[in-house]
Design a protein with these regions (language model features):
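Juxtamembrane segments of multi-pass membrane glycosylation machinery
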Residues: 4, 109-153
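Start-transfer (signal-anchor) and selected internal transmembrane alpha helices
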Residues: 5-57
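Alpha-helical transmembrane segments of multi-pass membrane proteins
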Residues: 19-22, 156-159, 201-212
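Transmembrane-helix motifs of polytopic, lipid-linked glycan transferases
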Residues: 24-32, 150-172
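Extracytoplasmic catalytic/substrate-binding loops of multi-pass membrane glycan-assembly enzymes
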Residues: 63-78, 87-113, 123-135
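Transmembrane-helix signature of polytopic, membrane-embedded enzymes
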Residues: 144-148, 163-186
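Membrane-interface transmembrane helices that cradle and orient dolichyl/undecaprenyl
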Residues: 171-173, 211-221
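Short acidic/glycine- and proline-prone juxtamembrane loop motifs at membrane-interface regions
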Residues: 196-199
Length: 221
């Protein structure tokens, strides 16, 4: 078992991983650009995605060099521990995917216990804490546990959910598309606190998908 304790939010590998990640994010954003090109709301896609990416980078700098410690550090260390668990034993991935919480008797738990931190081995037993790095793990595996790249991917996930919410309001009030864009897509606080390795990011994304799904079933039909 490899010990990897680090709260360095920026690593040398980000020099080549971050541009690659940004390329993939904008490639995915092209789907929205093409789909809504001939609508009044199509022009908001690229700015909404870009501002979230800027917010993710800014958050990484602030949490890494100003605060120096916070919830994101614990989530990130949890992701690193899961990364090494899967690296050591591929079957761990199935265990992480299928289980919504970790117990002290699980083979996975030793990675949190011996990672060099003091508190994480206790925090990670709380499902709400455990599930943040769990849901972010696919991006961590894809980009070699880069915090910045994980943040970029999660910022796009948040955009997807927020866009669904904006689309619902646009369908209800098409004449207010500009004001709705400012209120839903460009709210400053969400561009900082809802674009990285945080519970808020997943909550925003899930809320957008859930609300639009409920609207589609109960109202739009």
């Amino acid at each position: 078992m490899e010990q990897d304790f680090s709260w360095d939010m920026l690593r040398w590998q980000d020099l080549y991983l971050a541009p690659l990640c940004l390329l993939l994010v904008y490639f995915a954003a092209r789907f929205y650009v093409k789909k809504y090109r001939n609508t009044p709301i199509g022009k908001y896609v690229v700015p909404a995605v870009t501002l979230r990416l800027v917010g993710a980078f800014t958050y990484t700098l602030v949490i890494g060099f100003y605060y120096g410690f916070g919830d994101s550090h614990n989530y990130y260390q949890g992701l690193i521990d899961m990364f090494h668990a899967v690296k050591d034993d591929g079957s761990m991935l199935g265990n992480i995917v299928m289980k919504g919480k970790v117990e002290e008797t699980d083979p996975l738990y030793r990675y949190f216990y011996y990672d060099g931190t003091y508190a994480l081995k206790y925090y990670i037993l709380e499902p709400r804490t455990y599930n943040v790095p769990r849901f972010a793990l696919p991006f961590g595996l894809l980009f070699n546990r880069s915090f910045l790249c994980v943040s970029f991917c999660l910022s796009f996930l948040a955009f997807m959910g927020t866009w669904r919410l904006y689309k619902m309001f646009y369908e209800l009030y098409p004449h207010l598309h500009k004001k709705l864009a400012y209120a839903v897509l460009f709210m400053p606080s969400t561009l900082f606190w809802g674009v990285s390795l945080l519970k808020d990011t997943f909550c925003m994304a899930a809320m957008g998908f859930f609300v639009y799904a409920a609207y589609s079933v109960l109202i739009k039909k």
